[in-house]
Amino acid sequence: MRRHSTRKTVARVAVVALAVGVLAGCNTFKRLSEIGDGPAMSGVDNPTLRPDYRPVSMPMPAPMVAEPNPSSLWVPGARSFFKDQRAGEVGDLLTVIVDISNEKATFANNLSRTRGNKEGANLTSFLGFEGTLADVLPDGVDPASLTSFGSDSKHTGNGSMARSETVSMRLAAVVLQILPNGNFVIAGKQEVRVNGELRELTVTGVIRPEDIRSDNTIFWHQIAEARISYGGRGTVTDMVEPRYGQQVYDILFPF
């Protein structure tokens, strides 16, 4: 029975190791095919057809019914009598200005913990069990030691983090959805490949049409539920990231 359980444990470990190897191998083959050319840029596609796209649903105010007035040139809800060149419909473009300058964060934490515990009853007998145990144990039994125990633990930890970021870019985004209250759901993606390193900048969120400036631009801090991602892949990223084995070890190792 024990041998069967050991075989099952070994089989499970082998399956996990094989799965990790297959996943790493798939990415390895892809990276090997990019040697000399750098990471391949993705094609231009419809953002709403991406697997991670989710329509936005937010609380909305009560709708207002516009009453037509034939004798007026102005319609309730209109922003301007003349043609507005700013984004206003699904599929329109606008420029998002991302200017994250001198974003810094410093964090340090030191922890030292020591704990000791000791209990003893100093009993001369332990319900008569000391005689029975003396027949089994060659050195005899001290009743006081049966009711005394102690423990000691010590833990020391140090952690620190220093971060400095500067991102200054302009990114064209597309209006994907118009919410019932008139706000726009936008998304934009930009890829730049330089010397074998592919840098990606993505922006998604909800904006107000009133915040769009006359030159059809909007600042990143005016985007609600903003999701701004700046990263990449390539030779530089490979140098700064730990190897796959080290990442798996850090996740699975419990101590």
UniProtKB/Swiss-Prot annotation:
Disulphide bonds in the chain: none
Swiss-Prot/TrEMBL GO biological process terms: bacterial-type flagellum-dependent cell motility
Cellular localisation: Cell outer membrane; Bacterial flagellum basal body
Signal sequence, start to end: 1-25
Lipidation (S-diacylglycerol cysteine): C26
GO molecular function terms noted in the UniProt entry: cytoskeletal motor activity
Predominant subcellular localization, coarse grouping: membrane
Any one GO cellular component localisation term in the record: cell outer membrane
InterPro entries assigned to the protein according to its UniProt record, in alphabetical order: Flag_Lring
Membrane topology: Lipid-anchor
Lipidation feature positions (N-palmitoyl cysteine): C26
Keyword terms of this UniProt record: Bacterial flagellum, Cell outer membrane, Lipoprotein, Membrane, Palmitate, Signal
Oligomer status and interactors: The basal body constitutes a major portion of the flagellar organelle and consists of four rings (L,P,S, and M) mounted on a central rod.
Family: Belongs to the FlgH family.
Biological function: Assembles around the rod to form the L-ring and probably protects the motor/basal body from shearing forces during rotation.
Name of this protein: Flagellar L-ring protein
Taxonomic lineage: Bacteria, Pseudomonadati, Pseudomonadota, Alphaproteobacteria, Rhodospirillales
